[in-house]
Amino acid sequence: MAMSDPIADFLTRIRNAGMVYHDKVEVPASNVKKAIAEILKEEGFIKDVEYISDNKQGVIRCYLKYGQNRERVITGLKRISRPGLRVYAKKDEVPKVLGGLGVAILSTSKGLMTDKRARQEGLGGEVLCYIW
């Protein structure tokens, strides 16, 4: 069966792998998933990201990050805008996650970016997900 929401699948795979303390998770590649994985790496939620080409779609391998006593760095992921109900935010309505402790990922006219960067650049867009 065809996947109706690949971004939700990506977030769910990361959430499930984190719950059972896996070191890495592999997901089918797409440009949006690559951009989300890079943002997660820049924000310090995951250790590293690898792109593996298999002459088809390719695979993204994300290495998960844990604290000193194996506590999870990613405590929560939530898909906001979904295929059945799109959620958009104007430039002055960009949401803050947990008062700035979390990250909202937005799809803007200048590509995917965090809520902080969207506020700095004065951009709004589709609110893809929250990570904290």
UniProtKB/Swiss-Prot annotation:
Instruction: Provide the assembly information.
Output: Part of the 30S ribosomal subunit. Contacts proteins S5 and S12.
Any matching Pfam family: Ribosomal_S8
Q: Which GO molecular function annotations are given, in alphabetical order?
A: rRNA binding; structural constituent of ribosome
Q: Name one GO biological process term.
A: translation
Q: Tell me which UniProt keywords the record has, alphabetically.
A: Ribonucleoprotein, Ribosomal protein, RNA-binding, rRNA-binding
Kindly list the GO CC terms recorded for this protein.
ribonucleoprotein complex; ribosome
UniProt-listed PROSITE patterns: RIBOSOMAL_S8 (PS00053)
The entry sums up its family as follows: Belongs to the universal ribosomal protein uS8 family.
Q: What does this protein do?
A: One of the primary rRNA binding proteins, it binds directly to 16S rRNA central domain where it helps coordinate assembly of the platform of the 30S subunit.
Stated name of the protein = Small ribosomal subunit protein uS8
Q: Does the keyword Cytoplasm apply?
A: no
Tell me the InterPro entries matching this sequence.
Ribosomal_uS8, Ribosomal_uS8_CS, Ribosomal_uS8_sf
